[in-house]
Amino acid sequence: MASNSHNNYNTPRRQNYDVPKAWEEDSLYENIDFLTQPAVSSDTSEDEEPLLSVARRVEVQGVNPGLKPRGLVRPRQDADNPSSDEGFDWELWKLHLSTRAFSFLEPPRLSSSNTASGLRSSCSDFTILGSSGVNPTSHANLSEEEMYEEIPPLASNPSDERHPRQLSGAVAQGAIRKSPRKLKFKPAKFKGLSSSLLNPFTASDSGRRARRQTPTCQPGFTPIFQDLGEPHYVKACTVFFEGCMAAGKTTLLNFARQTLSDDEALTIPEPMRFWTEVYTNVLSQIVKINKECKPGKTSTTAELVSCQLKFATPLKTQSLFLQRSVKKDSEMQPVGPLDKWVIVDRHQLSALVVFPLVLMRRGMLSFSDFFNLLGMFEAHPGEVIALMSVNVEENFTRLKKRGRVCERHIDRDYIKEIKGSFNAAYCAWLFLQYFSIQTTMQICMGLSSLDEACATEGVCHTTASRIWNNRMLVTLSDIISQFSNDYTVQNVCYNFFSQLSTLKFVVIDLSAFRHDVPGAWGEFYMQVMKNGDIKTRVMDFTAIKALADTAHNTHLRSISFSSSQVFSTMLFLILLCVTGAQAITTPAPPRPATTTPRRGVTSAPLIVPASSSELIVTLDGTFHSVTIDMTEIRQYVRQEIIEALWNASHVFESLETTYNRYKDVYRFTDQSIRVNTRGSCQLVKK
């Protein structure tokens, strides 16, 4: 139960988990729909007492004073637990009620189609008022007229017969009030059962419009758990790029992927497909929460915890996969120029520590939920965090320039808070480099002061206080101050400090490399090489390459196709296959250089190697791969193929974005066709 103190760290979420309020008796019946709730079965005694108490209260208050006492009650028909001899052929959607006053002691009258004469029930499916302890089998010899009461006829109003009344009662302070909205879609749902309860999952609301599902392009399934053969162990440095959105992480990762070969570096992009297409779109949920939800609500903090867990799930699994690929009993060594690189976009530090800290400071995440997320943080030896940052104005300009829908709610203040939270996490790690985990725990628990710790460890008090006051450790100390004697709280704090101290940080200011990506990579490379604490691990490079290839294929193919895009792509592939077949069967002579190219296409020949090549077609910023056999094409490719490439590139939008991001849009192994934003093609030697 929730605490009654003014600092309530664990408020129950009644809106989400439906926690009953036992001290408010009337609230148990506020939203009860008596027409759809099944009658209480005769074998339950705990649930009958509150219902009978309400019934007595309503009868005493005179809700139905004219109702004569009855000797018998109609047999109950429990839709959830039907008797064995019932035929499951009730027509529940035909609800005919009498026009007289509503009573809790009299259930609604349902017309049954079991028999021609009327109702049919087993002898144990009824109860006699005032004699609940009598064995029901003793009334088996009663006639049907003595056993059942006579049902009065319905109203003679034709409109009532065509449209039977469907009342929905609810108890509020001893009175009955109608809630017609409860049954707005109930008859349609009952009618969808087709008078059968055997398949309740086929019910559908005919009044509601079904949501349109956009078809998505599902990438080919490449299992990363398959046997990849003999492992290939090499020394590799594992680096995780972190920082605010649009700080330059993905740009630097793509530069490393394009510049370095697969034998030198492997890159793993953000798991964007898992965040946007698997089960739910967590980016859209975050936007909705920031627009609609208010700080301080328990439902808001519950939704944010769900979102942060989804952000953290793929990041944790990637880190665990890399840890499993480390060779057992291998020692870490300092990084060298000939070592390999494993570069990952995002670490679980951002999903479980940094962004929850931002949300908690904004009042949207409770202290309890922030502390629970903090306890899930995990790091491994050898992991390096490359913290990248730019100034706020440059970061905001980049963010608005790329124009993502999920980032429209981000303003300058939000960017400042994210940068401050990353700086706070870095300062917490830096504090652990000066002080031991035990000393940090004593300061957070209030068992020791910062002055005593500085005197014991021999650290300058000015430096230590400046790092300590950077809000991360101060905030954590304030959160656990009232519960510092709890052993679970102590274990969570100790585990967080030990995991955080395992990491290694390098900070890169990209403000000086605005249009110089190679310079930014050089700055990152030199900082890693000069840091003697950064170590390499002996890792299975074959398994990591399989993970990287799968991650890139999933990242590049996660796109929703429209009908025009699918049609244009199919038309282009058919044209390409036809022209390629013509070139194979009847090779055309080379065109003269004086031939005027159509649509701005150059007529320079394209030399294709005799081996197979991969044609990469860009669809709105992503790649779609098609393998074409070029064995028989020796010297020239017909001009129509180049024109088809040019025409296909203009079918889709964001060509300028694609060109700036990937540069080489279409390529044949070692020679490529570059499509620029002015609408012309040129052959480029790679």
From Swiss-Prot:
Which Gene3D superfamilies does the record associate with it? Herpesvirus glycoprotein H, domain D-II (3.90.380.20), P-loop containing nucleotide triphosphate hydrolases (3.40.50.300)
Q: Does the keyword Kinase apply?
A: yes
Q: Where are the transmembrane segments?
A: none
Give residue spans, biased composition: Polar residues: 1-14
Specify whether Transcription regulation is a keyword of the entry: no
Q: Name one GO molecular function term.
A: ATP binding
What's one Pfam family the UniProt record gives for this protein? Herpes_glycop_H
Can you tell me which residues form the catalytic site?
A: 270
- SUPFAM superfamilies given in the database record: P-loop containing nucleoside triphosphate hydrolases
Task: Write down the InterPro entries for this protein, in alphabetical order.
Answer: Herpes_TK (IPR001889), Herpes_TK_C (IPR013672), P-loop_NTPase (IPR027417)
Q: What class of enzyme is it?
A: transferase
**Which Gene Ontology biological process is one annotated for this entry?**
TMP biosynthetic process
Please tell me where ATP binds in this chain: 243-250, 398
Identify the EC number(s): 2.7.1.21
Q: Any idea which UniProt keywords this protein has?
A: ATP-binding, DNA synthesis, Early protein, Kinase, Nucleotide-binding, Transferase
Q: How does it assemble?
A: Homodimer.
What does it do? Answer: Catalyzes the transfer of the gamma-phospho group of ATP to thymidine to generate dTMP in the salvage pathway of pyrimidine synthesis. The dTMP serves as a substrate for DNA polymerase during viral DNA replication. Allows the virus to be reactivated and to grow in non-proliferative cells lacking a high concentration of phosphorylated nucleic acid precursors.
Protein name per its UniProtKB record: Thymidine kinase
Per the UniProt record, the source organism is: Alcelaphine herpesvirus 1 (strain WC11)
